């Protein structure tokens, strides 16, 4: 029992893995209260964040049925939330696993829905609806929903792909999309699924999916249907009541109810029939269900054959069969906006069934010289998934990794620093010659990948936007795919077919793979047809395809069926109020729903000019944003497809509190996506642009004459805010920005410092066997040197040209190698200074 000054503790009434709840009396006014406190003596930063967010969220719920928060106290090292005590008991404890009689259920359920409706109207998504968080006062009948620890105040979230052991929410109740394995963002309808599971449990006394294993339970939410309610209870449950619960528990949000009003209307109709006639007849459910929020369905239209091709290929890879290969390469191609990335993520569900790993990385259009950028990003996500495993499982992975990597584990840690969290600090590797270092890197990297490829855990690697891949990454793909010992690996690459020609490095890589006997499968995505656009718009507006025919024909004509363009076009006409929700009773002739329907101004929409240029279209949209938002998004675009709040505060010279409203509104508008959870300051730190074309549109807002100036400023600020210990990890991003504006650097000392940074970047790229990137960095280092540098900064100049000689050799550029070697031999002051060049010149050329 805790002791908290100012409160008389009466009893503990609830205990979970993380928290305890006590009944108490506040001594100053004898007010009954509840105290919610974390159990851990030393709470994690994430737990503290959830508590602060819960208190803040509850304080923002200004309606009678909301639980009230009276204050936030501190007990030792943990916060204590002071909540009202209205004499309630959780439905979980009240029922004690017994089924609730139908009449009592129908008396409670509409009030629970009404409470949830008010929470949603306050723009809060609860994300943890379950009977333990629904509290009833049996005497007064008052119902309140509690526990807002993971609630979201955002209209939409993008849950990442996580280990099931670390998912937010109560696993038995979370929606398929909340698992992060459904290829879609999360909105208020996640609570409807959890509500459906809760209603199922209230009526049956059982959970719909009584699995114990976390991954198995996730798979049940994704793919399995629960037993019929009437097969589990003695009391006959009317089919329409079960139909309501089934609709709530639909696997995709589009198939569920779209409004709490619609759920409540159907439940109240059931209760009305039961009270007036003693029975419940069937009726068409969801007739009063209509969302007045504008939401474009996230499901794919017209891609059934392509999805089947992808899933069949994965099944081949994951099936244990000694007579067939278990490594495949699949290329997904098409113009920008065709939905290549979205299509690939449809593979989440079967991967979960096979207990496989899915990792992805994306090449950045503005940072093409960073070696292995997408590969490292993908493998870093894999390491993070492993860190969510239980300690015994993590120990098994540690043993596998150390056995496979041996004395060379440091090679991988230098590329993926987070791996050290699993295998611990590792000694530096032996220094070898350049060719031997290359060979070691290739061998160790292949061994590292093989650890995760097994029949128990097939591995899917998705590399997005291969048209922007660096040469080192393409060579690594070639290395992995031609490895005869690699099994249970499914490598998927996507690229824009209109940006690849016969001279592109990707073409050469694919030619080599075909010559090596690798079968390259391909999915080509084409624009949507008029019928598919018609169905998408009909689903969006909850109308029949016939009713929206005139609008959909115009949208198809304007967008040529490009899925991204269709979505953005619909958002544009909605923002312009040319597509709007008309409420009122007079609409009953249009639909069965008397709450309203969607209308549009066809003439206004017709005036929008047609364009095939998506960048121009997005740029036009962004120019309508407030100037401050345009500035922030254009700076974010300079940082990359993904960016973080810290770097944005540095380069914009704005505080987090100034940036937060801008980023939140941009997220609400679908321009950027949130990648991380709230931190201890209740800030989101990680973001990404929702699409490449949005990033390009934001970048295009910057005048061409100012781009070099801005990149130079970004490079300087990032460099200034990077410690010596962090420099190696951030070197490529810093140098890439500086190099875009290096010609504007006039001061000799700064030019030499930036030249030295390029030297460090070249050395790191060379060590990672990324010789093409290393050559670019070393050439820029040379350009930054003054003609008198051999005289005025001898050591730096010697280091740059000696390194250049070796890199030129390793990359097969023998003409500049000889030229730079001769220069070093001419300018070097001692024999010792010439050794590195002599070694390069003596290397065998075969």
Listing of model-derived features with the role each one plays in the protein:
Residues 373-460, 508-514, 518, 528-538, ...:
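Conserved Walker-type P-loop NTP-binding/catalytic site
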Residues 114-124:
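Protein kinase catalytic-loop region centered on the HRD/HxD motif
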Residues 287-295, 331-338, 343-349, 377, ...:
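Short secondary-structure boundary elements
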Residues 172-276:
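C-terminal lobe helix-coil module of Hanks-type protein kinase domains
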Residues 42-60:
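AlphaC helix of the eukaryotic protein kinase fold
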Residues 76-90, 94:
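Conserved short submotifs of the Hanks-type protein kinase catalytic core
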Residues 108-109:
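Activation segment signature within eukaryotic-like protein kinase domains
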């Amino acid at each position: 029992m805790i002791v908290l000054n100012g409160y008389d503790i009466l009893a503990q009434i609830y205990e979970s893995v993380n928290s305890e709840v006590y009944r108490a009396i506040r001594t100053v006014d004898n007010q009954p209260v509840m105290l919610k406190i974390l159990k851990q003596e030393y709470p994690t930063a994430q737990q503290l964040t959830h508590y602060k967010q819960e208190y803040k969220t509850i304080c923002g719920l200004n309606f009678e049925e909301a639980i009230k928060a009276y204050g936030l106290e501190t007990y030792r090292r943990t916060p204590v939330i002071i909540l009202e005590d209205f004499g309630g008991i959780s439905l979980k404890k009240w029922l004690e696993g017994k089924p609730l009689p139908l009449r009592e259920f129908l008396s409670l359920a509409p009030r629970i829905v009404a409470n949830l409706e008010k929470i949603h109207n306050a723009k809060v998504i609860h994300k943890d609806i379950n009977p333990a968080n629904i509290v009833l006062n049996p005497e007064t009948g008052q119902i309140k929903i509690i526990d807002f620890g993971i609630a979201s105040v955002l209209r939409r979230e993008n849950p990442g792909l996580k280990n099931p052991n670390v998912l937010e929410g109560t696993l038995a109740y979370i929606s398929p999309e909340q698992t992060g394995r459904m290829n879609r963002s999360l909105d208020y309808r996640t609570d409807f699924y959890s509500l459906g599971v809760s209603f199922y449990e209230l009526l049956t006394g059982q959970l719909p999916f009584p699995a114990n294993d976390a991954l198995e339970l996730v798979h049940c939410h994704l793919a399995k249907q629960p037993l019929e309610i009437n097969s589990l209870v003695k009391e006959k449950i009317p089919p329409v009541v079960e139909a309501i619960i089934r609709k709530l528990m639909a696997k995709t949000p589009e198939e569920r109810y779209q409004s709490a009003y619609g759920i409540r209307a159907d439940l109240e109709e059931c209760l009305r029939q039961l009270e007036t006639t003693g029975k419940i007849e069937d009726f068409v459910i969801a007739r009063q269900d209509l969302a007045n929020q504008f939401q474009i369905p996230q499901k794919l239209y017209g891609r059934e054959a392509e999805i089947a091709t992808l899933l069949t290929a994965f099944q081949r890879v994951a099936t244990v069969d000694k007579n067939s290969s278990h490594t495949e390469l699949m290329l997904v191609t098409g113009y920008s906006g065709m939905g290549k990335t979205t299509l690939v993520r449809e593979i989440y569900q079967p991967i979960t069934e096979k207990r496989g790993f899915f990792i992805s990385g994306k090449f950045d259009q503005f940072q093409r010289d960073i070696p292995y950028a997408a590969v490292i990003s993908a493998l870093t996500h894999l390491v993070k998934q492993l860190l969510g495993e239980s300690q015994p499982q993590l120990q098994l992975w540690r043993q596998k990794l150390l056995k496979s990597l041996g004395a060379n584990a440091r090679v991988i840690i230098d590329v993926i620093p987070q791996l050290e969290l699993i295998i611990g600090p590792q000694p530096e590797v032996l220094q070898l010659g350049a060719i031997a270092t290359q060979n070691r890197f290739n061998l160790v990297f292949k061994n590292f990948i093989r650890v995760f490829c097994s029949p128990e855990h097939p591995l899917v690697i998705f590399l997005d936007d291969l048209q922007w891949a660096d040469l080192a990454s393409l060579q690594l793909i070639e290395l992995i795919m031609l490895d005869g010992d690699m099994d249970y690996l499914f490598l998927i690459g996507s690229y824009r077919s209109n940006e690849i020609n016969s001279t592109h490095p990707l073409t050469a890589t694919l030619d080599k793979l075909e010559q090596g006997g690798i079968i390259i499968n391909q999915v080509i995505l084409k624009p949507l047809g008029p019928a598919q656009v018609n169905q998408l718009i009909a689903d969006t507006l909850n109308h029949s395809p016939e009713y929206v025919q005139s609008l959909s024909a115009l949208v198809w004509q304007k967008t040529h069926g490009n899925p991204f363009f269709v979505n953005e076009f619909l958002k544009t006409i909605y923002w312009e109020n040319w597509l709007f929700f008309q409420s009122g009773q007079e609409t009953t002739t249009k639909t069965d729903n008397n709450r309203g329907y969607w209308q549009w101004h066809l003439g206004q929409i017709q005036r929008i000019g047609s364009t095939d240029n998506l960048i121009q279209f997005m740029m036009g949209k962004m120019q309508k944003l407030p100037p401050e938002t345009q500035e922030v998004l254009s700076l974010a675009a300079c940082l990359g497809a993904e960016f973080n709040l810290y770097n944005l505060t540095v380069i914009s010279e704005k505080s987090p509190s100034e940036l937060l409203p801008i980023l939140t509104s941009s997220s609400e508008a679908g321009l950027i996506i949130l990648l991380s959870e709230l931190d201890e300051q209740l800030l989101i730190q990680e973001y990404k642009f929702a699409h490449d074309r949005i990033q390009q549109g934001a970048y295009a807002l910057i005048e061409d004459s100012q781009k070099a100036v801005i990149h130079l400023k970004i490079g300087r600020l990032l460099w200034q805010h990077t410690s010596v210990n962090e420099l190696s990890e951030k070197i490529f991003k810093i140098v890439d920005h500086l190099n875009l504006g290096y010609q504007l650097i006039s001061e000799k000392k700064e030019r030499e410092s930036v030249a030295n940074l390029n030297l460090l970047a070249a050395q790191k790229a060379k060590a990672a066997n990324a010789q093409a990137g290393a050559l670019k960095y070393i050439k820029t280092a040379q350009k930054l040197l003054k003609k008198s540098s051999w005289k005025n900064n001898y050591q730096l100049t010697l280091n740059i040209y000696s390194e250049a000689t070796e890199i030129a050799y390793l990359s097969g550029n023998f003409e500049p190698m000889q030229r730079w070697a001769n220069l070093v031999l001419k300018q070097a002051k001692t024999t010792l200074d010439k050794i590195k060049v002599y070694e390069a010149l003596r290397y065998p050329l075969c």
